[in-house]
Amino acid sequence: MDMIEINGGNRLTGEVKVSGAKNAVLPVLTASLLASEGVSKLMNVPALSDVETINNVISTLNAEVSYDKDEESVTVDATKELNEEAPYEYVSKMRASILVMGPLLARLGHAKVALPGGCAIGSRPIEQHIKGFEELGADIHMDGGFIYASTENGLKGTTIHLDFPSVGATQNIIMAASLAEGKTVLENVAREPEIVDLANYINEMGGNVSGAGTDTIIIHGVETLHGVEHAIIPDRIEAGTLLIAGAITRGDVLVNGAIKEHMTSLVYKLEEMGVNLDYQDDAIRVRVEDELKPVDIKTLPHPGFPTDMQSQMMALLLTAEGHKVVTETVFENRFMHVAEFKRMNAKISVEGRSAKIEGKSELQGAQVKATDLRAAAALILAGLVADGTTQVTELKHLDRGYVDLHGKLEALGADIKRTQA
């Protein structure tokens, strides 16, 4: 069993580079299935277990995938006749596998995709995906753990209003509509930077997607799409995690690949706490010189405060004086890390969807386990400032979303190592 061991107390200084965005590369990889001509080459691809999983899913669909971790690139050739079935063996490992359904429906007119797996955070329903496909003209039914989708006369453009701005549903419907007949208007959509990256990629392939980054996206279907080269945007969640690593240790760190426009709600909250941020071209320098002030956090869909930064921000709030409240509105059951923080002497109580933090916690090193991807990072952040040694286990979660986080922190001066227990 792998374990990360941290001896707390070191101030972090220096420069660090953010890897490519996990939440951008997965939909872009599945969108490569839309290209019936040419080969796609994706650059700045992070070396993550989730990337390997989606590559395996794409390979089972009869696309040729080549993954060069040293070059941080993936090439996808989807010009052959695709298979319709995404099997349970891979899809069960990761929810994002459902994102092959839109491209398969668009290319083949039918798809058979196992119900997905992934992080155990709340219900994360896929009803919005199914609603979108049905409104584009697909017949959907579920049987034996699979979702079956088909369309006799091809997908037809229409107006679709999402009940809530689901990121995955927005991506899946954009991909399906990109080869549909006519115009699709997609309302109340997700506005994340990863949506913009996907739209840019499809447009580079010859598609016609406009409005990404706003709450209404318009897709004019085209007959074919072709492979292209595309660089994945930096990971704003990793960037935020590294900014907090600098802040929590009261350090001085330059985070290359941190783009302010991708993380406005986070940086505003950090500044509200008294963290000094210096904005440069695609980089942010973080410094802390004074006592941090208490702030309240409420997670919301983008551009609100990201749920994927909630647990890391909670770690930082533990080191500030005063009364703080963290409210989680996006996912249910996303306070599982609180029990682990308490093992480290954190003063937190949970009531429903809110966690209350009283005063500054004198964190103590302890053995803790990661309950999900972002909790893993948050526990490591807490370990950076805890008195004594912190051991974080269940690193399979961490490896789904961070490339060499311990190595990057060690290069900044942390006393941290990864071992096999």
Swiss-Prot record:
Question: What InterPro entries does this protein map onto?
Answer: Enolpyruvate_Tfrase_dom, Enolpyruvate_Tfrase_sf, MurA_subfamily, RNA3'P_cycl/enolpyr_Trfase_a/b, UDP_GlcNAc_COvinyl_MurA
| Annotated GO biological process | cell division; cell wall organization; peptidoglycan biosynthetic process; regulation of cell shape; UDP-N-acetylgalactosamine biosynthetic process
Where does this protein reside within or beyond the cell? Cytoplasm
What reactions does this protein catalyze?
phosphoenolpyruvate + UDP-N-acetyl-alpha-D-glucosamine = UDP-N-acetyl-3-O-(1-carboxyvinyl)-alpha-D-glucosamine + phosphate
Residues involved in UDP-N-acetyl-alpha-D-glucosamine binding: R95, R124, P125, I126, E127, Q128, D308, V330
Residues of the active site are C119
Q: Which GO terms describe its molecular function?
A: UDP-N-acetylglucosamine 1-carboxyvinyltransferase activity
Task: Name its pathway.
Answer: Cell wall biogenesis; peptidoglycan biosynthesis
EC numbers listed for it are: 2.5.1.7
Query: Known Pfam families for this protein?
Result: EPSP_synthase (PF00275)
One cellular-component annotation, GO:
cytoplasm
Source domain of life: Bacteria
Q: Which residues carry this modification: 2-(S-cysteinyl)pyruvic acid O-phosphothioketal?
A: C119
| Swiss-Prot/TrEMBL keywords | Cell cycle, Cell division, Cell shape, Cell wall biogenesis/degradation, Cytoplasm, Peptidoglycan synthesis, Pyruvate, Transferase
Binding locations of phosphoenolpyruvate: K22, N23
**Family stated for the protein in its record:** Belongs to the EPSP synthase family. MurA subfamily.
Q: What does this protein do?
A: Cell wall formation. Adds enolpyruvyl to UDP-N-acetylglucosamine.
NCBIfam families in the record: murA, PRK09369.1
Name of the protein in question: UDP-N-acetylglucosamine 1-carboxyvinyltransferase 2
The primary gene name is murA2
